[in-house]
């Protein structure tokens, strides 16, 4: 059984026992989180939402809040002595999907 959820402006396919990375959520590690924006549930029978499936939710446990590996943003204009170097680390939350309720 798997479901398609919406979080952080993205759609993710999740199943029970799966670990996922999502945009940072404002909760602490070891707490539980519930996704109510379930777009579809696939199992013995398929349920599609318009736009969401009524009564469906996905429960997850927060493993950790962290920041991704640093990337370098380098802007450059030739012959103009313009160089701008900037780093960025995206914040994310790692979750363990515990239950899909449809």
UniProtKB/Swiss-Prot annotation:
Entry protein name: Large ribosomal subunit protein bL21
GO molecular function, one term: structural constituent of ribosome
Keyword NAD: no
InterPro entries, per database record: bL21-like, bL21-like_sf, Ribosomal_bL21, Ribosomal_bL21_CS
GO cellular component: cytoplasm; ribonucleoprotein complex; ribosome
Subunit structure: Part of the 50S ribosomal subunit. Contacts protein L20.
Keywords assigned: Ribonucleoprotein, Ribosomal protein, RNA-binding, rRNA-binding
GO biological processes: translation
Family stated for the protein in its record: Belongs to the bacterial ribosomal protein bL21 family.
A UniProt-annotated Pfam family: Ribosomal_L21p
Superkingdom of origin organism: Bacteria
Signal sequence, renumbered to the chain: none
Gene that produces this protein: rplU
Role summary: This protein binds to 23S rRNA in the presence of protein L20.
């Amino acid at each position: 059984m798997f479901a398609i959820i919406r979080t952080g402006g993205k759609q993710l396919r999740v199943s029970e026992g799966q670990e996922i990375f999502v945009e940072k959520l404002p909760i602490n590690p070891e707490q539980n989180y519930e996704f109510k924006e379930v777009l579809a549930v696939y199992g013995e029978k398929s349920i599609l939402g318009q736009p969401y499936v009524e009564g469906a939710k996905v429960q997850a446990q927060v493993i950790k809040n962290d920041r991704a590996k640093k990337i370098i943003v380098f802007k450059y204009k030739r012959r103009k002595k313009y160089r701008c170097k900037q780093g960025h680390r995206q914040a994310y939350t790692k979750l363990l999907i515990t239950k899909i309720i449809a």
